Amino acid sequence: MTPSTAAASYSVALSRLLEHTADAVQAVRGGQSLTAVLVRLPADLRPGVQALSFHALRWLGSATEARARLAPKTPPSNVDALLVTALALLWPGEPPPYAEHTLVDQAVSAARLRVPAAAAFINAVLRRFLRERDALVASVAHTPLGAYNHPPWWIDRLKHDWPADWQRLLLGANRRPPMTLRVNARRGTALAYVLRLAEQGRLAWLLPEPAFGGHAVVLDEPCPVLQLPGFAEGEVSVQDASAQRAAPLLLGPLQGDAAGLPAGARVLDACAAPGGKTAHLLEIAHLDLLALDSDPLRLARVQDTLNRLRLNTDGSAHVPAHLPAHPYPDGQAGVPAGSHVELRAGDARLPATWWDGRPFDAILLDAPCTASGIVRRHPDVRWLRRADDAGALARVQGEMLAALWPLLKPGGRLLYATCSVFKAEGQCQIDAFLQRLPPGSARPQPHAPGHLLPSPDNRTADESGRPAVVHDGFFYALIQKT
């Protein structure tokens, strides 16, 4: 089942789903994240509203331009939200989740529930759109907002940063993302999990490249996480392939050193929530790890993640007796004795408020950013961000780098990561940081990938028929302290 058709599988009346989807679109326009909207919905509404909201937000620019042509006088915000939601769902960019006549009929029914006086107006506008759709689509395609479904400032920034790739990045952001899994290396192998999925009738692909640590699996079709075998028992997590690069990069060998970090190394995950990278580190290494986050509520999500994966904070195993205890390479089971995980709330820019004075062997700084590299996975991001956000976040990133660098041991390494394709948050940030350091005090590692631009979706294969490497947009820089 694809996200564009997922809503059709739920028993809730479409008019109710459209009403709440319009509320979600209106909230995003007002600056609220889609996640914040969805968590307030009743459980029976949430899946359908999420599916329709993702579709509507991907085509919101085209729908907004079309509405301006169909109804030049902007209607009240609640009416406009329902109208552009329906137009986006009718837009020919991808298969509609419902038949056209059903969408129009149910949008009018939603209007009668939401704003009865506007029902006839919405009916007339939508039916006119269907009559004049080809001409309207052609007209809208001549505007940046209508052609690319991103704010003009975002388009301009990508043109500046990626003159050869900006169109591909913008158009790719409206394609559905792959669903990539990370198999818990303490519980099994990626190959064994692919075979287990096949027994359920689910097609999946290995990403065997060493850069991903050998634990990545891509589903041919996304599915609800609770339908994944072993998810509740901690055998697998959902994590994009780009994010799965962090742990192998941080723990692996540096230039001229084949050993990598030793067992028991002291590691800081400086912006740990929601805990995916923290967990990956613990799944593949024996560490003394401090997971830090400025938000205590988000830090609780790290604890939830570790609990589900049976990676608790005192080093003991939490593997139920009825589950197979897959052996570690050294023959142990569960979290290895001697490993230690501590969760602490604190601002990475203010080490004096949380640091105990013991230096770290390695620091992971997955810094707050615009999330411009994961917009296909979070389609509300493009409408929530403002033109000056990248500059403001870059200042925060710079402050974090400056505050954390002194906490490293000589010979230690810092991995800087953002899920952004904007260079101000990636290579430009690192270039400026290195220029501020004393000469010879830092050694950038050439095997870190730098900017990773979002790759094709999981329907794309190379000439051999093998699935392409699939990942979100990311940036990685690995720096050794000399």
Place the predicted regions along the sequence by residue.
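Hydrophobic/aromatic anchor residues within beta-strands of the central parallel beta-sheet
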Residues: 289, 341-343
